[in-house]
Amino acid sequence: GAENAYILAKTPSILENNMPTIGDLTVAFWMRTTKNTSAQGLFSIPNSIKFWGNFDIFLENNNSETQAFFKVHIFNQTAKENDERWVEAKIDDIFGSEWVHLAFVYDGNTSTITVYRNGEGVFTKELPDCGKLKFNNVGASLAVGAFQFSTTPSLTSGAGAQTWAKNFPGQLDQFRLYDKVLTATEIQSIYSGKE
């Protein structure tokens, strides 16, 4: 990782076709970093006309040497137009010199998001009536290690770079995106297999 580095991953065609009505979602990756002092983008499924993406994961400042403050933003185009949801998850033992495996799982059947750390569920929150994910204005690229608006050029016409928002300077590896709910057993297998 580097302060101004990020990855733009072209949305795979199979996912690009399914992304607008993805329904369920799992994002899994390994990360290694030290305490953050600013908001740092980790992942974004962009919305090409809004400030926030369709699905964003980022670190917020928590003033802790080991506990990370993750924020997840979901912009779901359900029957309730512009259904915007926020999830705040404080997860222990993230910062330091060791690699940590994380998985963020959204289940559209239960409207629940679960966060796994090193193969174990450590946080769950229900988002009442959120339902299956439906995204609009999905861009051709996904942002890894950045907010959608902090890339050059910005992935959205809704905003440009923000002074409070930084790219992720730590390390990310084996980043995975699934259009389904991975089970606890599957996530444990990815973690224990060091995949």
Residue spans of the language-model regions?
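Short hydrophobic/aromatic patches on beta-strands that form ligand-binding or substrate-lining surfaces
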Residues: 27-33, 102-104, 144, 172-177
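Flexible glycan-contacting loops in extracellular carbohydrate-active proteins
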Residues: 126-170
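Short tryptophan-centered beta-strand motifs in secreted/extracellular beta-sheet-rich domains
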Residues: 98-106, 115
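Glycan-recognition/cleft segments
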Residues: 43-76, 131-134
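Acidic glycine-/aspartate-rich tracts in secreted/extracellular proteins
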Residues: 33-37, 77, 108-110, 120, ...
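Short surface loop/edge beta-strand patches of beta-sandwich-type extracellular domains
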Residues: 1-25, 86-92
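Extended recognition patches within non-cytosolic domains
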Residues: 171-195
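Short, aromatic/His-centered strand-loop micro-motif at the edge of beta-sheets
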Residues: 73-101
